Swiss-Prot record:
Gene this chain is encoded by: yscQ
Family per similarity comment: Belongs to the FliN/MopA/SpaO family.
Superkingdom to which the source organism belongs: Bacteria
One record GO biological process: positive chemotaxis
Keywords: Plasmid, Protein transport, Transport, Virulence
Pfam entry (one): FliMN_C
Gene3D superfamilies the record matches: SpoA-like (2.30.330.10)
Name of this chain's protein: Yop proteins translocation protein Q
UniProt-listed InterPro entries: FliN-like_C (IPR001543), SpoA-like_sf (IPR036429), T3SS_OMP_SpaO (IPR003283), T3SS_SpaO/YscQ/SpaO (IPR013385)
Organism for this UniProt entry: Yersinia pseudotuberculosis serotype I (strain IP32953)
Role of this protein: Component of the Yop secretion machinery.
């Protein structure tokens, strides 16, 4: 029996990506941009930088040749690593004017012996780019702004409006006929506020006015399914589906299924996984293994439009 061999993904990468997801990852300045991501550093990194920003010390690794190429315009043909260290540090600080209060303390030749993903900082301008790997991500997270809405997928959420609850027995429901009248709960009426649910969570009250809804206050209620009221929309639970295949079966095949039956998904072993949420296709990925468990690495996202 052959076993499915999947690409490996480390639990440390999952944890670091989850932490990074809370913070802004793209920054622009007049001459270029800075991107934060997570990747495993190459084993051949040979340059170490000691920096200080906003009172916090950072250690970064990069390729020495990439650093020299990034500084080419200021070197006037001189080899960067033959310059006095004081001049090297001054040139570096000149290139980081988009980060006020950044101080370059030291630069040296050194290798990085790390075999796990790290936070990566990629600087880009025109046709030049350089990547740095940071050994202390948590220290930087403490200084970063929260992730803006512009860096989020504009996934619409469903808000349902629910009137007061009416409890009926099973026999009463079964006996309902066209024209039957149910008594509304005491104290309710046409002008009573309605409770808005976000997903399956009570969220806020609205007042119906003609064809408009006026938001009149947050809900602090709970229900049987959700004992805690929803106070932070970032914690809204959303059911997500990961499809490795979708197939149409004829009625005979479907009703004849039994233990041992085989269904051809017509999907390659290393085929794509579809990511769906709220009935919308969000993107595609590939199956990976994370410490003996299945995971999905997202490869591309689809454009989500709100209609």
């Amino acid at each position: 029996m052959s076993l499915l061999t999947l690409p490996q993904a480390k639990l440390s990468e999952l944890s670091l990506r989850q932490r990074l997801s809370h913070y802004q990852q793209n920054y622009l300045w007049e001459e270029g941009k800075l991107e934060l991501t997570v990747s495993e550093p190459p084993s051949s990194l040979n340059c170490i930088l000691q920096l200080q920003w906003k009172g916090t010390h950072f250690t970064l690794y990069c390729f020495g040749n990439d650093l020299a190429n990034w500084l080419t315009a200021d070197l006037l043909g001189a080899p960067f690593f033959t310059l006095p260290k004081e001049l090297q540090l001054a040139l570096l600080e000149r290139q980081t004017v988009f980060l006020p209060k950044l101080v370059c303390n030291d630069i040296a030749t050194a290798s990085l012996s790390v075999t796990q993903p790290l936070l990566s900082l990629r600087l880009s301008r025109d046709n030049a780019h350089i990547s740095f790997w940071l050994t202390s991500a948590e220290a930087l997270f403490a200084l970063l702004p929260a992730r803006p809405n512009s860096e989020r997928i504009p996934l619409p959420i469903l808000i349902s409006l629910r009137w007061h609850k009416v409890y009926l027995t099973l026999d009463e429901v079964d006996s309902l006929r066209l024209g039957d009248v149910l008594l509304a709960p005491e104290g309710s009426g046409p002008n009573s506020p309605v409770l808005a649910y976000v997903g399956e969570n009570p969220w806020g009250y609205f007042q119906l006015q003609s064809n408009k809804l006026e938001f009149i206050g947050m809900s602090h209620e709970s229900d049987e399914l959700n004992p805690e009221p929803l106070t932070d929309l970032n914690q809204l639970p959303v059911q997500v589906s990961f499809e490795v295949g979708r197939q149409i079966l004829d009625w005979h095949t479907l009703t004849s299924l039994e233990p041992g039956s085989l269904i051809d998904l017509t999907t390659p072993v290393d085929g794509e996984v579809r990511l769906l949420a709220n009935g919308r296709l969000l993107g595609h990925g590939r199956l990976v293994e994370i410490q003996g468990r299945l995971g999905v690495r997202i490869e591309r996202l689809t454009e989500v439009t709100i209609s």
